[in-house]
Amino acid sequence: MIRSDLPYPKTEQNGFTMFEVIIVVVVISIVAAFVVVRGTSKTVYDLASESEILKGHLRYAQYRAMSDTESWGLGLSANGYHLLKNKIAASDILPNESGPSHTLPSGITITAGAGTAVHFNERGSPVGDGDALLTAETEIVLSDGSATRTISITPETGFIP
């Protein structure tokens, strides 16, 4: 029942309050964010994470070489890599692995411009098979077929950005 003695008669209101509109917009934004994140290919995440894992393992081999008188490195194959000590397979365990090797997820491959292995000397510098310092940047490429991630190792210093 509408009271007529009010200066502005109260009428039935149709519509939404500003609070309701804001809540709906926030909920839709949150749902859209999850849909966009989940819609990205899994191999994109795998490629990024495998790139960081490989960098960590390269740094580990470099650290071991700097803590030892022998060279340390990683031997590369199309679907993974393994730890090397004095250019032969090592039995030491890679960080966060259960053994001296790491297998890449299916669909991701690895190639290196320097060949099938990356070695570091006691100064942490990348060296070739004959222990000569490398004069060019060493590049290791991880690929999932549509995207690539390149890891570069700086000559002489062994810096891995």
Question: Where does each model-flagged region fall?
Answer:
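N-terminal helix-rich module
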Residues: 2-8, 16-19, 25, 30-59, ...
